């Protein structure tokens, strides 16, 4: 028995509607991709030969795997006078967190945590910014210099810090960032998340000592300087700092 023609078949100018049509109001909402984005995110086989053959390797040049990691977890009391810590302290050994010999390359640095104020300070109406500097010390000696010795500041303000002219050859600022917290009874922002990941490719050299200390560095120590801009209200920073490094093949 043939099917009966439905009323919409006899109407002029109508077309059959698919059952799979999506009438959801969200159907037309989605990420718009233009030609520029498609070109930037094009697959590797559509790129020139130079991009396909000259890709950087995961292992740093002159090094060998596996990728090792060292973590520094600490709560810091950051004041206006600043603080410094060495993040290239790696003890000599055979573990996944140790260096095999004198030389290794820090491939990348990962900083994760937050800056926050205590109960008494967060009730005061003020804004405080915490400045961070990742510095490479090319010729480390003795103990790390404090922030006032390395940086030149106008009116004792850490936000205007630049490396002193006579120390520019030794200290090199690799990265710089800041986090801001605000105190008060109403529109307060008492804590701020800190999250940074950098590729540094820093080749560190130790002496014959096994302990991972700043005084045992001979070349390219990594230092993290911290200071807040408010003179009377300190800030706390709970940070986990991880360095990913490879041992040198010349050890």
Curated annotation (Swiss-Prot):
Superkingdom per UniProt: Viruses
Zinc finger intervals, unnamed: 63-80
Cell location: Virion; Host nucleus
Extent of motif Nuclear export signal: 96-117
GO molecular function: DNA binding; structural molecule activity; zinc ion binding
Motif (Bipartite nuclear localization signal) on chain: 3-20, 195-242
GO biological process, one term: viral penetration into host nucleus
Gene Ontology cellular-component annotations: host cell; host cell nucleus; T=1 icosahedral viral capsid
Key words of the record: Capsid protein, DNA-binding, Host nucleus, Host-virus interaction, Metal-binding, T=1 icosahedral capsid protein, Viral penetration into host nucleus, Virion, Virus entry into host cell, Zinc, Zinc-finger
Motif residue range(s): Nuclear localization signal: 35-49
Matches recorded under InterPro entries: Gem_coat_AR1, GV_A/BR1_coat, Viral_coat
Function, as annotated: Encapsidates the viral DNA into characteristic twinned ('geminate') particles. Binds the genomic viral ssDNA and shuttles it into and out of the cell nucleus. The CP of bipartite geminiviruses is not required for cell-to-cell or systemic movement.
Family: Belongs to the geminiviridae capsid protein family.
Subunit-structure text: Homomultimer. Binds to single-stranded and double-stranded viral DNA. Interacts (via nuclear localization signals) with host importin alpha-1a.
Protein name per Swiss-Prot or TrEMBL: Capsid protein
């Amino acid at each position: 028995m043939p099917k009966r023609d439905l009323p919409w078949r006899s109407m002029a100018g109508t077309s059959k509607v698919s059952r799979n049509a999506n009438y959801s109001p969200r159907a037309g909402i989605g990420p718009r991709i233009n030609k520029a984005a498609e070109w930037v995110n094009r697959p590797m086989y559509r790129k020139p030969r130079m991009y396909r053959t000259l890709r950087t390797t995961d292992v740093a040049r002159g090094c060998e795997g596996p990728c090792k990691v060292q973590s520094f977890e600490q709560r810091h009391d950051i004041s206006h006078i600043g603080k410094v810590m060495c993040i290239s302290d790696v003890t000599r050994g055979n573990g996944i967190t140790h260096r095999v010999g004198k030389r290794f390359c820090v491939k990348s640095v990962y900083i994760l945590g937050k800056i926050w104020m205590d109960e008494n300070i967060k009730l005061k109406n003020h804004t405080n910014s915490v400045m961070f500097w990742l510095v490479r010390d090319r010729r480390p000696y003795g103990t790390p210099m404090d922030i006032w010795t390395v940086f030149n500041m106008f009116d004792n303000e850490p936000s205007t810090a630049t490396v002193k002219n006579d120390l520019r050859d030794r200290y090199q600022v690799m990265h710089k960032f800041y986090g801001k917290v605000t105190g008060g009874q109403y529109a307060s922002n008492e804590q701020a998340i800190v999250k940074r990941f950098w590729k540094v490719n820093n080749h560190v050299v130790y002496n014959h000592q096994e302990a991972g200390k700043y005084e045992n560095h001979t070349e390219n120590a990594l230092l993290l300087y911290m200071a807040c801009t408010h003179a009377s209200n300190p800030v706390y920073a709970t940070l986990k700092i991880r360095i990913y490094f490879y041992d040198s093949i010349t050890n």
